[in-house]
Every structure is written in structure tokens, then in C-alpha cells.
Amino acid sequence: MGPRARPALLLLMLLQTAVLQGRLLRSHSLHYLFMGASEQDLGLSLFEALGYVDDQLFVFYDHESRRVEPRTPWVSSRISSQMWLQLSQSLKGWDHMFTVDFWTIMENHNHSKESHTLQVILGCEMQEDNSTEGYWKYGYDGQDHLEFCPDTLDWRAAEPRAWPTKLEWERHKIRARQNRAYLERDCPAQLQQLLELGRGVLDQQVPPLVKVTHHVTSSVTTLRCRALNYYPQNITMKWLKDKQPMDAKEFEPKDVLPNGDGTYQGWITLAVPPGEEQRYTCQVEHPGLDQPLIVIWEPSPSGTLVIGVISGIAVFVVILFIGILFIILRKRQGSRGAMGHYVLAERE
């Protein structure tokens, strides 16, 4: 995997870890993704920022233009000039902080000539009971690097080479307290403002359409449970065997992808013994559903019809072949009989 792919891969992993943890209860989140490259030959700017409320991109900032751009209609049309000014100033401040942190990490690694990348994800999540949880993580050159611990005001090193930076940052207690204040106070306050701003959009609930499909190969029979076109994206999917929940280790983990229209799709798969498909059911829980939805695989009527048509055609072809063969044999027998009478008549 080349260096261009590593930052994107790390961001996806961090995002799944910190934000995409499917929970049945409706939660809301605000998080920012920062990324940059020390040299622009990696296809990245020196600093780019993406802001997400829940799972919707609402703001973008780029170091080169130093412009803050709204990315959703409800932000463009509803945000006040004062709130937009505060958001713009904070992103420009993050730009400066990111650059300082980037050079600190590079110096602690004795990296100066080569191109390197830095990724940061920070934000907060709010549950229905208004409890909040913050996160602040750094990735360097496509690898997890440092994570801030607001309870203890220190940093957790994800790899040995992160220790010099960890020790340096832990000497700055003022910064640690500022980080905690952001995660526990400023981030939840901004999230509340954005939720109010996005009322009617962010609080909608679209239940999933659930289907179970059947796939057969030479040696494996696989059931796939798909949940389609739902919002929000937190969803619980599991397999039941004889109406009893199965251990998650027995089937492949859930995959979730955006559809591009604001909704999501997710699926889980399970290998089953041939002929035992009816023993397994898929259970789906989602905030848009009043109760868990249980779906079983049902053979497609069209599939049965196709098999019947193919069988009928095969029988017809066999009968037609036998009929043609019978006619040919009778003609040959008739020809031989006529030849025999002609020869006898000639001898007389």
C-alpha cells in the first residue's frame, strides 16, 4: 500500500472507531478531521479540515485558500453571521495548531527531508441522556500515534516512537486543560447549536428495508442480510439460529457504507450448511423501527419458475429428439422394404 492511500485508510479506521460505533439509542456527534502533508507531492494540502455533525459533512477549510466553506444547505441558509465568524476563527486557529504539532512530531522523529503526513480526529458524542464523551487522536504516516486522555490529562502513545512527543506535551499542563475544556464544554455546546440549526434534517429517522439473500457456490452456502436506505447510520444487525442469538464471532462483522443521498446501507453474512437455511434469521434494530425486525430467507418464486421452465424445455427437447429419431428409423425401414420387392420382381 503506497503512501497516498495510508492517510485515507487511517482516517477511515479512526472514524469507525470513534464515531461509527452502532448504538441503538440515538446519539449525536460532532467531529473534525484534520489532515496535511509536509510536502505537497503526496496530493495533500499543508492542512485541510472537514467538519461533521452526526455523519454529515457541514464545513470545509483549506490552508491554501484560508477559506471556510459550508457544505450543507441547512448550514448555508440558517447559520448566523456571528456563529459563522466563530467557526471560521476556530478553524484558522486549528490550522496554526496543526502546523506546530506537525513540526514537533517530525522533529522528535528526526524527520526533515522526506514527505510525511499527519492526521487528527477530535470531537464529542452526546447520548440521549445528555452525557458526553470526547476523543482526540493523532495519526502519523498512516499509523495510530497519540491519543489524549481527558480524565488524566495525559497522552497515550500508540507506538514507541510517539514517546518523545508524549513526554513533551505532558509538560504543558495548560494545553492539556484547554484540550479537556474543549472536549467537555466547547464541543458539546457547539454540537447543541448545530443540532438546533439542523432541526428537521439531523433528527429525521428513516427505517431500513431489510432483505436476506442466498448465494451458493460449489462448497459453501452463504446468507447475506442487507439493510438498505436507512438514517441515522447507527444500527444493530445479528443472526439468530433457531430463534437464539448467535455469537458475533460466528459471522462476518457488519459493514456500513453511505449511499450518497444521506442514507446508509449495511450488511452481515453467514456461511450455513446446505439445506439448513430456514433455521437462520436476521434481526435488525434501528431508531426508525418501533421494534426489532426479523427477516428470513425465502426462495424466490421467480427462481422456482425459471427452474420449472428449464425442466419443461429439457423434457420437450428429449421428446422431440425421440420423435425425430422414430420418424427417421421408420423411413429407413420403409426404404429397405421397397428395395426388397423390386429385386424379387426383377428375378421373376
Curated annotation (Swiss-Prot):
Checking SUPFAM superfamilies in the record gives: Immunoglobulin, MHC antigen-recognition domain
So which residues are the signal peptide here?
1-22
Tissue-specific expression: Expressed in all tissues tested except brain.
Q: What is its main location?
A: membrane
Gene3D superfamilies documented for this protein = Immunoglobulins (2.60.40.10), MHC class I-like antigen recognition-like (3.30.500.10)
Membrane protein topology class: Single-pass type I membrane protein
Q: Where is the Ig-like C1-type domain?
A: 207-298
| Regions that span the bilayer | 307-330
One Pfam family here: C1-set
Q: Which family does it belong to?
A: Belongs to the MHC class I family.
Under the subunit heading, UniProt states: Binds TFR through the extracellular domain in a pH-dependent manner.
* Protein name per UniProt: Hereditary hemochromatosis protein
Organism taxonomic ancestry: Eukaryota, Metazoa, Chordata, Craniata, Vertebrata
Q: Which gene encodes it?
A: HFE
